[in-house]
Amino acid sequence: MTGKGRLVLMIAFSMAIAGIATNRAAAQPAGHLNQIHHVFVIVLENKSFRETFGPNSPAPYLSKTLTSRGALLENYFAIGHASLDNYVAMISGQPPNEDTQRDCPLVTEFVPSRPEIDAQGRLLGHGCLYPRNVATLADQLERRGLTWRGYMQDMGKDASREKETCGHALLNTRDKLLTATLSDAYADKHNPFVYFHSIIDDQAKCDAHVVNLNALKADLSAIASTPNFSFITPNLCEDGHDHPCVDGRPGGLISSDQFLRDWVPIILNSPAYRSDGLIVVTFDEAGGGEAEDSAACCNEVAMPGARLPPGRNGPGGGRIGAVLVSPFIAGGTASAQPYNHFSLLRTAEDIFNLPHLGLAGAPGLRAFGRDVFLQRTSSQQH
């Protein structure tokens, strides 16, 4: 084969792996985003906006301290129920399917209803483990020469359940990592990276990038060792999912708030955050049983042929809110602009000048904008 022929094949292969990203031009970051070079996303569990940010909130650090330092997105929505479909959306732009809506109790391959990704960047079908042609934000960052890590609290704490790195249930088995034990409260349904072949098929890559939360402190010690994108998942007690927790702690928002009190100051004091960081704290979905539980925004629709809408009994995952803290955000900012998890992905992609994956590229969907960020220089940090 000639050198030219090999080059053509290499380009074709790269485009196939890039999948969704290949037909979506990268957006040039707006002025309020191109100052940010380190993003930290912390995802908590199962609370509505009213529970978290209402007058009787049991989470004063999140609802008062952090909002006074940053921005509160009052109309930020989840995109479905239960957990896994929301986590998948945050890093891939893929919508809910009937298996991710149920948190994939049986881990199966994704079965496409058609082999190609559609014009909206979706791979239609059902299943848990997405094929290699479904790209993630992690894949995009690597191709751009940028760094990422997923930090999972408790992962590998009980070595008989899962590894300390890249811990996940095996294909075609019942997932035993969906609930907490006294020795280990890690849940792989809250770790979106392990549901993509593009990540788990390279064991060394997955082990290096999907790690226990204990690694975060050392990584934050210098700008050079801090990933450009960090995705932080507490365990099933400290993310608020369980209440009470298996070890007797209260769980819910009380334990979530304590997790933030413990970890957010460490990030705030890190060189990377102080230079050019953005912290996003949000929830996967609203809690059950409320009128707003399945509310949606941003023209979200179900996948064609879906048996259920994204929220099972409604169009979305409920109004949950989000708090953003950054040297480039004025404390006490509040925005009523509608956003959702696809907006979060779109924002991260715009920050790093990446194409929009899946429904992050939906027409009319907005990245976090000037309603949130100020045009500030690094010398104006607070």
Where in the sequence are the language-model features?
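Bacterial N-terminal signal peptides
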Residues: 8-19
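Residue-level detector of intrinsically disordered/flexible regions characterized by low predicted structural confidence
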Residues: 6-8, 25
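N-terminal pro-sequences and low-complexity stem/linker regions of secreted or lumenal proteins
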Residues: 25-382
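N-terminal secretory signal peptides that target proteins for export/translocation
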Residues: 1-4
